[in-house]
């Protein structure tokens, strides 16, 4: 009888054991949507909103009273720790890519009028030359919590790296709470740690198939193991010239002119999302052959290209061990 009671008690404990469950929170931030899945019952929506508010106040060029807007107006201002992290990372990637990644090119991008009919309108070369005088992150220095610009017209825009940084901030928030299983996604930029406790498997994320008609579908699903992934596409924001050549919104940081490209999508896997985000942007402008050469000295970066060949057919290329599934 005693043995029967013990067996029944053990069976009762197993039957009462909670099934693994994730918490999923969604919302809007940085002009896009976000989705966060994590292994905890606690709702952190308010904490996320507070973190996003602080990041926007620091680096949003859409907010007139943000720190970066004040710096772009040449107002004396002390930057915060978020700005320091992103600025220093931008400096390093600017150096590594020999200026291809440059957060000061935004004014030139904005100056190009692509026109409502999808045709690249002419832009006076003198205006481009004038704008290019203020381009170059090497013209901007950080002195502790002060930003110093050699040219007062230099316009700083962290749009190509800040979204990935926001992903990392949420991830680090979880790790401070000892939450080790999570997936953070903001506008397609992703950071994954641990596993999906519901499925008891690695986090699966999709690589989107390019469509020029704005439809969405997944080309393939891959597993992320304590990594981050960012994707930069050229197939949604492009215009054509009079000869039918397609141009994306990529501006050559050396010339100030848009570049013709056959690249459609570039996905980069790195240890943190800020790094992946910045390199995905840079690799759009570098092109496949230059990226191949670059990756020889950067084994920490995994890259996946989707591009058009000479027959206007889609092709893919995986580099540095980008996962197949």
Residue ranges and their predicted role:
Residues 1-24:
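Bacterial Sec-dependent N-terminal signal peptides
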Residues 16-325:
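Mature catalytic core of soluble alpha/beta enzymes
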């Amino acid at each position: 009888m005693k043995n029967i009671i013990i067996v029944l008690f053990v069976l009762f404990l197993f039957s009462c054991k909670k099934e693994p469950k994730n918490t999923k929170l969604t919302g809007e931030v940085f002009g896009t949507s976000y989705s966060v899945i994590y292994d905890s019952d606690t709702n952190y929506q308010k904490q996320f909103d507070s973190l996003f508010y602080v990041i926007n106040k620091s680096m949003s060029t859409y907010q007139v009273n943000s720190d970066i807007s004040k710096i772009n107006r040449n107002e004396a201002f002390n930057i915060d720790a978020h700005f320091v992290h992103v600025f220093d990372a931008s400096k390093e990637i600017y150096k590594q890519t020999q200026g291809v990644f440059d957060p000061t090119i935004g004014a030139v991008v904005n100056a190009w009028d692509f026109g409502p009919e999808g045709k690249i309108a002419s832009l006076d070369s003198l205006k481009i030359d004038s704008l290019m005088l203020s381009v170059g992150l090497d013209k901007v220095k950080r002195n502790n919590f002060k930003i110093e610009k050699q040219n007062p017209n230099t316009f700083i825009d962290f749009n190509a790296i800040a979204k990935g940084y926001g992903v990392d901030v949420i991830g680090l928030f979880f790790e401070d709470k000892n939450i080790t299983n999570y997936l953070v996604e903001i506008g397609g930029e992703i950071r994954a740690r641990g596993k999906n406790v519901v499925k008891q498997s690695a986090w699966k994320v999709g690589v989107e198939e390019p469509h020029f008609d704005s439809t969405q579908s997944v080309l393939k699903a891959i597993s992320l193991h304590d990594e981050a992934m960012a994707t930069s596409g050229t197939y949604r924001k492009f215009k054509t010239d009079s000869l039918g050549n397609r141009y994306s919104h990529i501006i050559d940081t050396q010339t100030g002119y848009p570049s013709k490209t056959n690249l459609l999508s570039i996905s980069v896997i790195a240890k943190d999302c800020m790094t992946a985000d910045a390199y995905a942007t840079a690799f759009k402008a570098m092109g496949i052959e230059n990226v191949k050469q670059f990756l020889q000295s950067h084994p920490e970066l995994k890259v996946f290209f989707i591009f058009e060949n000479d027959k206007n057919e889609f092709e893919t290329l995986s580099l540095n061990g980008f996962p197949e599934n």
